[in-house]
Amino acid sequence: MSEMTPREIVSELDSHIIGQDKAKRAVAIALRNRWRRMQLNEELRHEVTPKNILMIGPTGVGKTEIARRLAKLANAPFIKVEATKFTEVGYVGKEVDSIIRDLTDAAVKMVRHQSIEKMRYRAEELAEERILDVLIPPAKNNWGVPDESQEPSATRQTFRKKLREGQLDDKEIEIDLAAAPMGVEIMAPPGMEEMTNQLQSMFQNIAGQKQKPRKIKIKEALKLLIEEEAAKLVNPEELKQQAIDAVEQHGIVFIDEIDKICKRGQTSGPDVSREGVQRDLLPLVEGCTVSTKHGMVKTDHILFIASGAFQVSSPSDLIPELQGRLPIRVELQALTTDDFERILTEPSASLTEQYKALMATEGVTIEFTREGIRKIAEAAWQVNERTENIGARRLHTVLERLMEDISYDASESSGQSITIDAEYVGKHLDELVADEDLSRFIL
């Protein structure tokens, strides 16, 4: 798991997300507390439970982006889910328990990748030997078995050197490789994904791993053999146990759009995708044991981060038990013109940099002036104020409209340089921004 300090985490988030310092600090502290807990003695460690977070803020201000970036920083099992995808137990649709199953699958994949990376050096050696056995078969004793007591021949060592230097990459050889597992597609109604996964695993296990001769270039064969040999060196049972432990101790679940499962006003009849889902989430957030195909997983120490815009509802519309299990509240602020200007220039892969790089592939050089960027930011802010406020996502719409002519003609304009200044932006956007009906439908 990540050993970054809160200040380092915030600094890393700052290079991708503008503003929202309170939210960044909250997730940075929560992530660091995961590491701090693991430094405690076992008795006290069991008592320290994570403080779950509720992020509140309008759409397009960075809630989901914080989750995406956090997933890369955490170096721990992480899953992002939409609250609207789930229904109450007993109804058609996904149950909330599938969150933990998916998290465990992600952990198994992560732990397997880490284990294979650790074994890569040994796997590379074994893969080399298998290729050399095809190129220069080893000497055999009187019983027809390869004689391992003999030193490798000078020819074999020469070929090994050539193989490592890449001189044999384009040479074709015939070698036995593990055949791809038999694929069995099973159609099942929604909510039955777990059953179909188990059936598919069963059919694959019945088929077993078979070796199949293939004619292939050495470069490709080496890649496949390294993966095959690394997989043999990994213990599947040990890997499953490590994955379950990683989920239980370091797992993070991000639940987006939680405001969409709030009960609004008094409604009669079953509310299978709102209050029912909240009730089903309670045991997961509080701590329970979920059965997965890899084993039983306890959720007591999994960190839950929920987020929602809460534009037509408020956090108090969540059922009281769930409110109590999300003790840390963080409010994200609506974006201003200055924020939009910073979003266009400061992040490491800002929108303006992306458009410059895209046009450079056609040989067109794009330059954004400071005044032009300010004008784009003002246009996006004005449209947000007059119509629906969709936050930073409005910049995508405005920029796409602004760049439409350049993008269309780029393939015939190789070698040109185009400067996007305040005058250029005004010429292409002023009419749309001023006309509320046009901006409502086009921007």
UniProtKB/Swiss-Prot annotation:
Q: What does this protein do?
A: ATPase subunit of a proteasome-like degradation complex; this subunit has chaperone activity. The binding of ATP and its subsequent hydrolysis by HslU are essential for unfolding of protein substrates subsequently hydrolyzed by HslV. HslU recognizes the N-terminal part of its protein substrates and unfolds these before they are guided to HslV for hydrolysis.
SMART domains of this UniProt entry? AAA (SM00382), ClpB_D2-small (SM01086)
Query: What would be an example GO MF term here?
Result: ATP binding
Keyword terms, alphabetized:
ATP-binding, Chaperone, Cytoplasm, Nucleotide-binding, Stress response
**CDD domains in UniProt:** RecA-like_HslU
Q: What is this protein called?
A: ATP-dependent protease ATPase subunit HslU
Kindly list the places in or outside the cell where this protein is found, as annotated in its UniProt entry.
Answer: Cytoplasm
Biological processes per GO annotation: protein unfolding; proteolysis involved in protein catabolic process
Family the entry assigns: Belongs to the ClpX chaperone family. HslU subfamily.
